[in-house]
Amino acid sequence: MPTFALNFSRPAGQIVSQYYNFLRLGFEGYRKVQNACYHIAQHFAAELRKMGPFEIIHDGNGGLPAVCWTLRDGGDHGFTLYDLSDRLRTRGWQVPAYSMPPAREDLVVQRILVRHGVTRDHTDLLLEDIQRALALFKNHPVSRNLTKTEAGGYNHN
């Protein structure tokens, strides 16, 4: 069965410090931290949606404080998410584009995860760089899109 997993590997020292923070902050403190992450993710999704070419798959409301998007169906956007990922990398962002597992390999997505420490200022800077990339693609359409292999990224297979 095809799956879509989020894998994280963290050193044990960070687990110990997280446990300490949980004891220090308590349930209510952790709830506030997580709610702040959700609000930032929802703000990012709302602003990204306004840009036009993106279809929001998950807007950070419930579940993980993450935003996942793809390009809207129909029409030639003049770029792929692989192209956008590459362009964002030149500005210092790592927002990979990748296709889904078998049975949905036709769907290419990008996503961000909002963790503690990511601020609205950070996401606003990312939104500005996405807008800058869209303007570049509009003025200088990509004549040959990057392939999945050329763009690199993560494979969930």
Predicted regions, residues:
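Conserved C-terminal alpha-helix-loop-beta "cap" of PLP-dependent enzymes
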Residues: 1-8, 22-157
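Catalytic-loop motifs flanking and including active-site residues across diverse enzymes
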Residues: 10-17
